[in-house]
A protein has these predicted regions:
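Structural beta-sheet core signal
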Residues: 4-6, 49, 101, 127-130
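Residue-level signal for inorganic ion chemistry
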Residues: 6, 32, 85, 102-103, ...
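Short phosphate-binding loop-to-helix
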Residues: 63-98
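Acidic metal-phosphate-binding loop of nucleotide-sugar-dependent transferases
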Residues: 78, 104-108
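Short, high-confidence coil segments that cap the C-terminus of an alpha-helix
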Residues: 44, 94-96, 124-127
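Conserved core of the sugar-phosphate nucleotidyltransferase
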Residues: 109-179
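N-terminal glycine-rich phosphate-binding loop and ensuing alpha1 helix
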Residues: 1-56, 68
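Acidic helix N-cap motif at the loop->helix transition within catalytic regions
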Residues: 56-62
Length: 179
């Protein structure tokens, strides 16, 4: 099966909205609901959302009515939140499941991208990371000068990123064990 982990455990302090960024609304719908809906429309049968501690009621309300969705409290860093979310998925899904890791702060991902990432993993890819061309001018800054970087060689990394659940969880457990 295809399952998803939506990372929404950030506090959103840089945004200055006074609530977690994932709960901010875009067109009357929270970012987290838009992101989870895209995962479901793209084929995810189960979705785990990592959330900040103490926000369980707010996230339950934001995600009300969406099928196959559960929330777990994330950790202090994104990597911790991903590991905790993967552990939750591993308790309910086989290790061979395709897991799509997605940032709640990217609510406009088309379900077609979700399906393409999942399909590539199902067809044998070990890891699938969608990228888009960089359109902005980028400068590499040194001590006393700077130069334009050839943007034709650059790509911006997007989510969801696809893997096999067991392999990604094992990598995260190893990283956590090594500190």
């Amino acid at each position: 099966p295809v399952v998803a982990l939506v990372v929404a455990a950030g506090s959103g302090s840089r945004l200055g909205a006074g609530l977690p960024k994932a709960l901010v609304e875009l067109g009357g719908v929270s970012l987290v609901r838009r992101s989870v809906s895209a995962m479901i429309e793209g084929g995810a049968k189960k979705v785990v959302v990592t959330i900040p501690s103490g926000t369980e009621a707010e996230f339950a309300a934001a995600l009300s009515g969406l099928p196959g969705v559960s929330c777990v409290v994330g950790g202090p860093q994104r990597q911790d939140s991903v590991r905790l979310g993967l552990k939750a998925l591993a308790r309910m899904c086989p290790a061979s499941s395709v897991v799509l890791v997605h940032d709640a702060a990217r609510p406009l991902v088309p379900p077609s991208v979700v399906r393409r990432v999942a399909s590539a993993v199902l067809e044998g890819a070990v890891a699938v990371i969608p990228v888009v061309p960089v359109h902005d001018t980028i400068r590499e800054v040194g001590e006393t000068d700077s130069q334009v970087v050839d943007r034709d060689r650059l790509r911006a990394v997007q989510t969801p990123q696809g893997f096999r659940l067991g392999a990604l969880l094992a990598a995260h457990e190893e990283a956590a064990a090594q500190g």
